[in-house]
Amino acid sequence: MLLLPLANAATNLPKSAPPLVSAVRHDMYDAISPAHALAHAAQGLAVLITGSGRGVGRAEALAFAQAGAKKIVLTSRSRDELDEVKKEIEEATRDHRTPEEGECEVLVHVADLCDPASVDVLFEAAGELDVLINNAGYLEPCVPIRDSDPSEWKRTLDINHYGTYLATRAFLRAAHARGVGEEQGVGGDNAKKEVTVINTSSIGSAGTRPGFSCYQPGKSMINRFTEFVHFEEPAVRTFALHPGGVMTKLARDSMPPDTHDSLTDKPELAAGFAVWLATSRKADFLRGRYVSANWDVDQLVAKRDEIVQMDLLWTRVVGQEQVMPHSTHVHLY
């Protein structure tokens, strides 16, 4: 099966918007580093990361552990990879945890994220969780629709969207069962317990690369799905995160060769950004929205008023009046 070259792509594609921030990041930096600004930021958190055997998921697991998470749940279809990541976490955190943080509990669970029963067993075994990162993904070969393999097309949709749905559904049900959204504390402390869901989106969700008729629309679905969680679940901090252009095994196998030179971002970039989203109240104005790990977080926070007032970073049809609730009518941050 031949990969579709860019030269065959249509030329009249939608125009791109100007960059949201001027500082574009490609690797970990102090503001999102668990060794610097985010040291101990994840203390007390229990985190489940799907697709955590390699690539971005592996980096996210290590970053949360280094930031002080009390429990990391690793899951994918490959036990060997997960065991290796568990060993890495234990070695990386040994002698680097405060007495308050204690040891990081690392659980390994092999699961089929497209099987509801398997997902239910996963979340039962995981126990109480504070953060879910839906990182598992798949990428179909870049070919025109007429030449596509239906099984590859469906597999991409199943893993990227259906798997995200099943994991999020199980996470939300477990969260509600333990009182998430209800008032915590006594007396004047009316804070409500919140949890966080980070869904893996893509810059491709806002673009049209002929040949990726499932992956890119599927990531647009992830953006919209994230919005639904946001508007349905006030106590859930949810984000659709583009992890950057990372040369993962999937990208190497399925992305056209002419794109490989642009895949220069480090998986640690997305990992640090995910820790920042999950632990920083400065990120609250981004709840429900698409966000890119390439965007410098300090510049992003400086754009808060502009993003909120102009209602940016939602997925919509330009020119069509909005039928979803306006963000400021639902949650004010």
Report the location of each language-model feature.
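Catalytic Tyr-X3-Lys loop
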Residues: 138, 146-165, 198, 222
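A short, exposed helix-loop element centered on a Lys and neighboring polar residues
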Residues: 168-169, 227
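The beta1-alpha1 cofactor-binding region of Rossmann-like NAD(H)/NADP(H)-dependent oxidoreductases
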Residues: 80, 109-121, 150
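C-terminal helical subdomain
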Residues: 11-19, 23, 240-241, 257-333
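Conserved glycine-rich Rossmann-like NAD(P)H-binding loop of the short-chain dehydrogenase/reductase
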Residues: 69-85
